[in-house]
Amino acid sequence: MNISMHLAVAVAAAACLCVCAAAPENRLARTKQQRPTRGFKNVEMMTARGFGKRDRPHTRAEHQDSYDSHARRKFNPKSNLMVAYDFGKRSGNDDVTDEVYGLDNFWEMLEATPEREGQENDEKTLESIPLDWFVNEMLNNPDFARSVVRKFIDLNQHSFGLVRERDAEQSRFRAICGPQVH
């Protein structure tokens, strides 16, 4: 080989080394576009109950005849421990036959409750609700909490709580829930 060929190979090798030395240390990451959120957009629908594996035993259309939904039970504070159906070892064949105390029943009971501001706290009232149940529902059921705020705090339904609304409803709430609420 002649000297010009060696010189051309040396220049090409030097150019490759310069290009490699000028490259960044870490690998360039491609910028991906963010995917749009799929599914339900609001939080209430994303956490809705009754969706998924535990909704019913068979989700196929041919097995829907055998699925019988459990009737809603009414709240009874003196009954045995109330458990959720079809979760784990629990089944719908429990001996408790009461209805679950639902949101509709709660508001019907409150609407039918007479104002008891003048009554003494000694009287046993059937209209009072268990505080433990109420707190549990407020923590675990955002729809229930929202409806309680609308019923008790926002009297004129304008989405702003006023001090006089709070004071009026606080006395009504104490009358309904009993003396243990502060």
Swiss-Prot record:
Compartmental location: Secreted
Major localisation: secreted
Entry keyword annotation includes Cell membrane: no
Signal peptide residues on this chain, from the entry's feature table: 1-22
This protein's GO CC annotations: extracellular region
Record's compositionally biased regions (Basic and acidic residues): 52-70
Keywords, comma-separated and alphabetical: Amidation, Cleavage on pair of basic residues, Neuropeptide, Secreted, Signal
Superkingdom assignment: Eukaryota
Propeptide: 23-37, 55-182
GO-annotated biological processes: neuropeptide signaling pathway
Free-text function comment from the UniProt entry: Neuropeptide stimulator of juvenile hormone synthesis.
UniProt-recorded name of the protein: Allatotropin
Biological source species: Spodoptera frugiperda (Fall armyworm)
